Amino acid sequence: LKFEYIFRQVGFVILLAIIVAALVGLFSQGVVSSAEKINATKSVRLDYERFGRRQTESRMQLNFLVKAAGKSTISLTAENSNAYEPGSVWPQPDSMYSHGGTLYMVYDELKKGDSISVWIFITPSRAGKWNNVIRVNNEPGIQFWQFIYP
């Protein structure tokens, strides 16, 4: 009988810990999961979720200031090219292509001084910890990681 009581108490503590972890975002969106990274020159900012679930869409917001009128290219490189399936991008780029494990999004008609915010939606197709790099033009890249639960 004492064993059953102890087992019930331990089970309650474990269940409570799982619920608290989920509420703070350890398994997806939340305080622990939400992250912001800025590149070395402080010209590009990325808001994203550190934790996600396989086959569940997640979003990233990339903010940058256009330094020269004309074409701007955003590149997203994942450690494993099969780790993510690209989804929608808003605003839509004028062209988009991939080469060597890197996804390129090209915006042709941007004006100097514009503050641009791009939303990128991706769906993780594999579980694990993935290291990624996102870059705008020739600016220093932002390295970030995501842990994807099965």
Per-range role (PLM):
Residues L1-N39:
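A eukaryote-biased signal for short, well-structured alpha-helical docking elements
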Residues A40-L76:
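Short extracytoplasmic
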Residues T73-A83, V136-E139:
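Short acidic, flexible loop segments centered on an aromatic residue
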Residues E79-P93, I142-W145:
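Short aromatic-acidic-glycine turn motif
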Residues Y97-H99, Y107-D114:
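Short proline/glycine- and polar residue-rich coil/turn motifs
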Residues K111-G128:
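Low-complexity, intrinsically disordered segments enriched in Ser/Thr together with acidic residues
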Residues G128-Q143:
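Serine/threonine-enriched low-complexity regions used as flexible
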Residues F147-P150:
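Short beta-strand edge segments in extracellular beta-sheet folds
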